[in-house]
Amino acid sequence: MKLITSSVELLPETSKFKSVERAARTCYKSEAKSDDTEEGAKEFTERMIKNGHYAMLDHAPVYLATNDDSIYEFFAKNPYSSVHYLPNPADYDSAYCYYITTNYRVLVENDRISLLEFEVEPTKFHNRFYSVKFICSRAIANEIVRHRTLGYAQESTRYCNYSNDKFDNEVTFIIPGSVQTNETAEKLTDAYTEFTTAMSEAEKHYLSLIDQGWKPQQARDVLPLATKTELVATGPISSWMHFFELRCAPSAHPDIQTLAKDLYKQMFNREWSDDIITTTDDTKESESGSVSTSTVDSDTTQG
């Protein structure tokens, strides 16, 4: 049995295909199989598409710039894309009037791959995407994935067999903040002992069921909510600001508050303050200091 604390990491930007591979390999914890090349990532992404695993394409942002009205009209109606319109581009030292933020999945599912000819590096007029890696308990992950305008890839207890060598033949659990920060040493010792005993029992039963021939998707039913999971979440800054508004709030669970405030500091290099106001106005200025996009949002993900 392994006990760790939760953590969050703002992932570095990379190519579309490497973003897809990075997220997808989280599900099976197969990162070691990646050859870490652009060609390998492209082939991996093509296999995802061939097998219909489009959800992983959510993690590949695409930034476009164009003056074509027909392209604007398509993305303006697409609930998973954002469009920013500049009526007088010259006033902004720009050659384009439409700045579009979307993802690779939208292009693939709508047979619009040809629009990649309009792809540009992200500008201040785009609704910038960020990918984040959470290492947390299943309980906290359940709260994170309720933010449905983000795309997710999560470590799978169906396919990850924790009795295997690559997991050191053990189950990893997250130590809850309540156990870490109890008021007195005596209470902390008692609570910690009871917690670790419960986790040890769960691991024992899980490994025993695997040894008896059960598959991971069956044996996982005895694992508690404190079981460690890894989760990659990707989405535009507008979605992340909504995440911060809800998860940094005093009413949020203490453990997710800690993660959210840590992530906010990583994104903006300053501490979260309850005085920060986030809005969904189409003309708001984003936290990054750039002009945000006019966004068409939906309450459902693409898959």
List each language-model region with its residue ranges.
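Family-specific signature for flavin-dependent thymidylate synthase
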Residues: 1-303
